[in-house]
Structures are given as C-alpha cells and as structure tokens.
C-alpha cells in the first residue's frame, strides 16, 4: 500500500473514532445476520461481520435483495459492527 493510501486509512480510522464516542456507540442492527450474497447485479467484493469470529470477512455480494450485513470496505464493517462495550 502506498504512503498516500496509508495516510487515508489512518485518517478514516481517526475520523471514525472521533465522531462517535465509544460509550454511546451502537452496532448496526444487521451485524448479527448471516451473510447474504443477494441475487442480482454483478458480483462485487463486500464485507460482512462474522459474529462467531468477531471480525469482518470478505464475501461476494451481488448487489440487491441481501440483508444489511454487507459493507463496501473492511473499515466500514469494523466501524459499524465491532462491539464497543
């Protein structure tokens, strides 16, 4: 990863941490649902939260009719689904 990419990632992580205080953070309501790849559109890489492993994992998402446990990046998945207790 280039230094510009690392700086961007660091900035996003900082922004996520600063905008939402840890004590008041609530998880996305669909984080506990199993991954659902959907059934239409082109296949693209997305991320879902794995409740058993307590981490975000990549999967193939088809763009519609899935549940809300899909995110465009690992970072967004972690921001929305990691437990803050």
From Swiss-Prot:
N-terminal signal peptide: 1-24
SUPFAM superfamilies reported for this sequence: BPTI-like
Cytoplasm in keyword set: no
Tissue expression summary: Expressed by the venom gland.
Cystines in this chain: 31-81, 40-64, 56-77
GO molecular function annotation: potassium channel regulator activity; serine-type endopeptidase inhibitor activity; toxin activity
Gene3D superfamilies noted in UniProt: Pancreatic trypsin inhibitor Kunitz domain (4.10.410.10)
Keyword field: Disulfide bond, Ion channel impairing toxin, Neurotoxin, Potassium channel impairing toxin, Presynaptic neurotoxin, Secreted, Signal, Toxin, Voltage-gated potassium channel impairing toxin
CDD domains recorded: Kunitz_B2B
Coiled coil: none
Xref: SMART domains: KU
UniProt entry tagged with the keyword Lipid biosynthesis: no
BPTI/Kunitz inhibitor domain boundaries: 31-81
Location(s), subcellular: Secreted
UniProt cross-references to PROSITE patterns, sorted A to Z: BPTI_KUNITZ_1 (PS00280), BPTI_KUNITZ_2 (PS50279)
PANTHER family, per database record: EPPIN, WAP FOUR-DISULFIDE CORE DOMAIN PROTEIN 6A
Function: Beta-bungarotoxins are presynaptic neurotoxins of the venom. The B chain is homologous to venom basic protease inhibitors but has no protease inhibitor activity and blocks voltage-gated potassium channels (Kv).
Protein name: Kunitz-type serine protease inhibitor homolog beta-bungarotoxin B3 chain
Taxonomic classification: Eukaryota, Metazoa, Chordata, Craniata, Vertebrata
